[in-house]
Amino acid sequence: MSGGLDVLALKEEDITKFLACSTHLGATNVDFQMEQYVYKRKPDGVYIINLRRTWEKLLLAARAIAAIENPADVCVISARPYGQRAVLKFASATGATPIAGRFTPGTFTNQIQAAFREPRLLVVTDPRIDHQPVTEASYVNIPVIALCNTDSPLRYVDVAIPCNNKSVHSVGLMWWLLAREVLRLRGTISRDHPWEVMVDLYFYRDPEEAEKEEQTVVEKPAVKSDEVQDQWATTDIAIQPPQQEVSDWAAESIPVAPPGQPFMPPPAKDWSASTTEDWSAASGPAPQSALNGRWHLRNWG
């Protein structure tokens, strides 16, 4: 299909991506309809997929998707957890309608339910896992494009893209390549320049690993601040208090705490407390006449 045009030929960088993501590795079993896409069989029993046939079917699927006038009429589905992020990214890039997660039975056939849809094209990640939408698509004459492994059933599948649909990186790469080819056929991006969107954005990320990465990023600055505080605590810096110039020499001296000890203010004086003094010792005993006179005055009132 793409042998006559150099623009559509398989590039070396794309082959490198295929091999790095293990797209060429199939399963240990093979369906009789998938034998035409098998290149060889390894000694351990794993079938090797012909990547040239994979690329040709990928271009055919991209042409079918680009031929739909309204991008929202293309429905992309993935019930597998590691294909849901790729489906959502593909839908945001091309404008398709995503169904990530469980497919509600009757979405294509039951007109009463609120989630009823009438798409013109269906793209699924695995025809074995997504058998319900594939079966319903056959009832209402919707063409189906599927990412198929060597052991995938091809019943009701119109365009089968042979690849490894059980690998996290392989599924993300196939959706990324399909989105790139659709945008190139629509004229949104140029073939002369590489697509600025990275393949890593289409890969599945485990929520637990993502939380661990966020926690490590948050904990790193806190550890650094604790280390700085420990360094300042261990280093002994002798700080000499500044000498204050005293212009009034009659003033009291300013107490200065020695280095390494906290400063303690001088005790406050209690001006209300009166000092006890023995006035009788200085003045002597009172005269007897005064005491007698005071006695008589008290008696006579």
Swiss-Prot record:
Pfam families: 40S_SA_C (PF16122), Ribosomal_S2 (PF00318). It is found in: Cytoplasm. GO terms for molecular function: structural constituent of ribosome. Residues 256-301 are annotated as: Disordered. The keyword Ribosomal protein applies. One of its GO terms (cellular component) is cytosolic small ribosomal subunit. GO terms for biological process: ribosomal small subunit assembly; translation. InterPro entries: Ribosomal_uS2, Ribosomal_uS2_C, Ribosomal_uS2_CS, Ribosomal_uS2_euk, Ribosomal_uS2_euk/arc, Ribosomal_uS2_flav_dom_sf. Residues 256-268 have a biased composition (Pro residues). Keywords: Cytoplasm, Ribonucleoprotein, Ribosomal protein. It comes from the Eukaryota. Gene3D superfamilies: Glucose-6-phosphate isomerase like protein, domain 1. HAMAP family: Ribosomal_S2_euk. NCBIfam families: uS2_euk_arch. Required for the assembly and/or stability of the 40S ribosomal subunit. Required for the processing of the 20S rRNA-precursor to mature 18S rRNA in a late step of the maturation of 40S ribosomal subunits. Belongs to the universal ribosomal protein uS2 family. Component of the small ribosomal subunit. Mature ribosomes consist of a small (40S) and a large (60S) subunit. The 40S subunit contains about 33 different proteins and 1 molecule of RNA (18S). The 60S subunit contains about 49 different proteins and 3 molecules of RNA (28S, 5.8S and 5S). Interacts with ribosomal protein S21. This is Small ribosomal subunit protein uS2.
